[in-house]
A protein has these predicted regions:
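Active-site pocket-lining/capping segments in soluble small-molecule metabolic enzymes
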Residues: 1-119, 130-224
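N-terminal capping/small domains of soluble enzymes
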Residues: 123-124
Length: 224
């Protein structure tokens, strides 16, 4: 099972401990192209691959504008060392579809039926899909029984509930003259959210971990 785990990295110092435990697949949110997580530049990521000889994947989860796309095109020649890119904006697919770079489709809440999933899996360099974590057990079984390639199943983390390209925390701070922070807890009587912001926008996570680990023994992992 360890060889199937993909760990998103928050701090480069974590990797040594994961590596000692036999984990060799790591996901790095890419600087300038990711939101909601600590990010890393290509030099940092490549140094990890060179040091540990592990599989490295990039997370590109921002909505990109034309300038972003043009800038991304400039780094494509530097991406040959990565094992794959988990992307959200279809522009990434359009820019990389004629390369040898492996892609993993990840449109957040949309990967909930095998028809959509298989459409993307039919593309030449799309090797997998990140399933939505809203799937009920019977829905998950149906998807796994019918997908044409192996997929990625989220098993532990926070659900991203909202993403805005606006810097909402800064807007609030400027409007109400409060001290600005790029991380905040927002809550009312019913629910609590973790807000994170960078120059590219703001995301809200439902501030309670989903945990699928206890259910793994009941899930057929042939397609995972």
């Amino acid at each position: 099972m360890k060889n199937k785990l993909l760990i998103r990295i928050n701090n480069l110092l974590e990797i040594e401990e994961y590596y000692k435990e036999g984990i060799t697949n790591f996901l790095f949110p890419l600087s300038c192209y990711s939101i909601g997580y600590n990010t890393f530049n290509l030099d940092e990521i490549k140094s990890i691959k060179d040091k540990y000889n592990v599989n490295v994947y990039l997370l590109v989860n921002r909505v990109l504008d034309n300038k972003d796309c043009n800038n991304f095109k400039l780094i494509i020649p530097k991406l040959s060392f990565v094992n794959g890119i988990i992307y959200e904006d279809i522009a990434i697919y359009q820019m990389l579809k004629d390369t040898n770079i492996n892609l993993i489709w990840n449109q957040a809440h949309f990967a909930v039926n095998y028809h959509s999933i298989n459409y993307w899996l039919s593309k030449d360099n799309i090797i997998s899909c990140m399933l939505a974590n809203e799937l009920e057990k019977i829905e998950l079984k149906t998807v796994l029984d019918n997908v044409n390639k192996k997929v990625i199943l989220p098993i532990l983390g926070l659900n991203m509930a909202m993403y805005s390209r606006r810097t909402l925390l800064k807007f609030y701070s400027d409007t109400f003259k409060t001290e600005y922070t790029d991380v905040a807890i927002l809550k009312n009587d019913a629910v609590e959210f973790l807000a994170k912001e960078n120059e590219y926008g703001t995301v809200l996570f439902y501030n309670k971990y989903f945990n699928l680990i206890p259910e793994l023994e009941h899930i057929n992992d042939d397609k995972i």
